[in-house]
Amino acid sequence: MRIALLSYRSKTHCGGQGVYVRHLSRELAELGHDVEVFSGQPYPEGLDPRVRLTKVPSLDLYREPDPFRIPRPSEIKTSIDLEELLTTWTAGFPEPKTFSLRAARVLAGRRGDFDVVHDNQCLGTGLLQIAKMGFPLVATVHHPITRDREVEVAAARWWRKPLVRRWYGFVEMQKRVARQIPELLTVSSASASDILTDFAVSPEQLHVVPLGVDTKLFQPREGRVRNRIIAIASADVPLKGVSHLLHAVARLRVERDVELQLVTKLEPNGPTEKLIAELGISDIVHTSSGLSDEELAALLASAEVACIPSLYEGFSLPAVEAMASGTPIVASRAGALPEVVGPDGECARLVTPADVDELTAVLGRLLDSPRELRRLGDNGRRRAVEVFSWQSVAAQTVAVYEKAIARVAAC
């Protein structure tokens, strides 16, 4: 099968979407399929040699180290470039739409090259153009971004709320496009339920295929650091619940030596950075970002507890990576987290989202119980190996491709 895999951002440091592209494309190639990734910036790294990469460049207005840069007039070459610039200048996020339009232009010249096109969370209007060209189309919706919008609007000060709503303006487009794609993949039953509610798609459109984990890379190791907690957040946003964990860590340090390894890129002088200083825990909170896979795996395996305090997750790759590492988890009872980690007390302890008292108490009890830490860690490793396989993800995804191909052939 010849597969075009579209992703408007694909670097693994940008979050789970990049991890998904890299591992899914590799396992599809392992099954004998021909895979070509079409990506906007930042481009993927570490793709399997059998997987081709076609770059779909944008103006890249969020690139480091000069985000929100002003492009040179000579860079504005098409109406799509102009739309990207104007949307950014008016506080919107253009990438899902503008990437999809550029991808449609590229694929228009390659109509005979692919059996199926698979979109990764873009859900831009360009996908409808791709479908009209006759390509069988599948899209992955990791979770409905309506949930991110809801949390961020609630957390924003009154004067920022309109700006947050404007930033998330692309969500209404994603709703409209999703309703017109017959085959949608998502990564958990919880996410599927939320997509049904928020996007008003039909149940027949949705196929649940949980994500996988590399259990050879993420595995238990010797030398865990006493009282070390690790948390991984793909973005410095209220949805990840990091502020609640920081308050818990500040309380824990009163009674014990404790250390937090926070893997995220903090907004300079942003709310999280300020909170760390206000709580007086700068000496025990160590932040890092841009880690290699090997560095992340080593750090996860060095901690006694992994904490996932999110207010919502459509899946949570850090959860399955922690389980594969044999690292016990304390996670919020939110979104798909209970579905991913299993019943409370099996591989993880579940707590009420945003409840600092409960989070502090559960973390403290776990850190005081080496036997419970070992039991949860062993169970987590077993669950990761038995349940979360990228090979299975690829095989189930191919089955959905076949449905999309058959649907188009029948028309």
UniProtKB/Swiss-Prot annotation:
Keyword Electron transport: no
Temperature notes for this entry: Optimum temperature is 40 degrees Celsius.
Statement: the UniProt record of this protein carries the keyword Transferase: yes
Signal peptide bounds: none
Molecular functions per Gene Ontology: D-inositol-3-phosphate glycosyltransferase activity
Regulation of activity: Activity is significantly enhanced in the presence of Mg(2+).
BP GO terms, sorted: lipopolysaccharide biosynthetic process
Catalysed conversion reaction: [3-O-methyl-alpha-D-mannosyl-(1->4)](n)-3-O-methyl-D-mannose + GDP-alpha-D-mannose = alpha-D-mannosyl-(1->4)-[3-O-methyl-alpha-D-mannosyl-(1->4)](n)-3-O-methyl-D-mannose + GDP + H(+); [3-O-methyl-alpha-D-mannosyl-(1->4)](n)-1-O,3-O-dimethyl-alpha-D-mannose + GDP-alpha-D-mannose = alpha-D-mannosyl-(1->4)-[3-O-methyl-alpha-D-mannosyl-(1->4)](n)-1-O,3-O-dimethyl-alpha-D-mannose + GDP + H(+)
pH-activity relationship: Optimum pH is 8.5.
Domain of life: Bacteria
Keywords for the protein's UniProt record, in alphabetical order: Carbohydrate metabolism, Glycosyltransferase, Transferase
Listed EC numbers: 2.4.1.393
CDD domains attached to this UniProt entry: GT4_PimA-like
SUPFAM superfamilies xref list: UDP-Glycosyltransferase/glycogen phosphorylase
PANTHER family: GLYCOSYLTRANSFERASE WBBK-RELATED (PTHR46401:SF2)
Function statement: Glycosyltransferase involved in the biosynthesis of 3-O-methylmannose polysaccharides (MMP), which are intracellular polymethylated polysaccharides implicated in the modulation of fatty acid metabolism in non-tuberculous mycobacteria. Highly specific alpha-(1->4)-mannosyltransferase that can transfer mannose units from GDP-mannose to a wide range of alpha-(1->4) oligomannosides longer than three mannoses, including all hydrolytic products of MmpH.
Family: Belongs to the glycosyltransferase group 1 family. Glycosyltransferase 4 subfamily.
Protein name: MMP alpha-(1->4)-mannosyltransferase
The gene coding this protein: manT
